[in-house]
Curated annotation (Swiss-Prot):
Assigned keywords, A-Z: Corneal dystrophy, Developmental protein, DNA-binding, Metal-binding, Nucleus, Phosphoprotein, Repeat, Transcription, Transcription regulation, Zinc, Zinc-finger
Tissue: Expressed in testis, ovary, heart and skeletal muscle. Expressed in the cornea, but absent from the corneal endothelium.
SUPFAM superfamilies: beta-beta-alpha zinc fingers (SSF57667)
Gene name tied to this protein: OVOL2
Protein name (database record): Transcription factor Ovo-like 2
Zinc-finger ranges (C2H2-type): 119-141, 147-169, 175-198, 214-237
Function recorded in the entry: Zinc-finger transcription repressor factor. Plays a critical role in maintaining the identity of epithelial lineages by suppressing epithelial-to mesenchymal transition (EMT) mainly through the repression of ZEB1, an EMT inducer. Positively regulates neuronal differentiation. Suppresses cell cycling and terminal differentiation of keratinocytes by directly repressing MYC and NOTCH1. Important for the correct development of primordial germ cells in embryos. Plays dual functions in thermogenesis and adipogenesis to maintain energy balance.
Disease: Corneal dystrophy, posterior polymorphous, 1: A rare corneal disorder characterized by small aggregates of apparent vesicles bordered by a gray haze at the level of Descemet membrane, an altered corneal endothelial cell structure, and an unusual proliferation of endothelial cells. Symptoms can range from very aggressive to asymptomatic and non-progressive, even within the same family.
Family listed: Belongs to the krueppel C2H2-type zinc-finger protein family.
Amino acid sequence: MPKVFLVKRRSLGVSVRSWDELPDEKRADTYIPVGLGRLLHDPPEDCRSDGGSSSGSGSSSAGEPGGAESSSSPHAPESETPEPGDAEGPDGHLATKQRPVARSKIKFTTGTCSDSVVHSCDLCGKGFRLQRMLNRHLKCHNQVKRHLCTFCGKGFNDTFDLKRHVRTHTGIRPYKCNVCNKAFTQRCSLESHLKKIHGVQQQYAYKQRRDKLYVCEDCGYTGPTQEDLYLHVNSAHPGSSFLKKTSKKLAALLQGKLTSAHQENTSLSEEEERK
């Protein structure tokens, strides 16, 4: 097989770099971890007390196996790892030199839930503080999708997920960027765009509720209140299913506002006719 197709595997182990290979002008540009620098420049207390005897012992151990390797480069980091029985010196450092370990990004938990988590899922073990949150989570394990998309037939367990998906078909993007006029289907996408692209930091606290935006799913109209949305849908889309889902109390309240507004308009028109 030609050498072009041969792939050389890199060793996963951490290789110890010899400082003797670098010239003096390049040693200043080499990165040295802080923890390793302390071990290199601050020898243990027992080494300080010996004084010149440490150098003599280093030369005498050159004949022993491994002695020449340790005395060849005083600045070379040791590849030994601390044993469980190693003791700490007075300055808090281990008596034996150790290889610097990279900080892991994996978070380890004790496996115990707090007292606030009282409702847990029997299928996956996830915990929730409220029963309604658990009920909503259980829908994701249900194989039957109750809410279907009328455009492509894809099923969802939640109406919110269905609404978010339908906007990809209708092209309704109610959340617009004030800087570049780019529009998004979700508020979180707009906030992420402002932070990453324009560097705009949001002025709300963690988990603080934002001002809700009421969106007409038929034409993309946005209103600050549900009443404004109801008035718009009632006038522009009388046959919309949104009117059927609206509560009777809100419908009666808004219907009274509609009649009062209609009466005001008729009274103004009558006054204009009299003039």
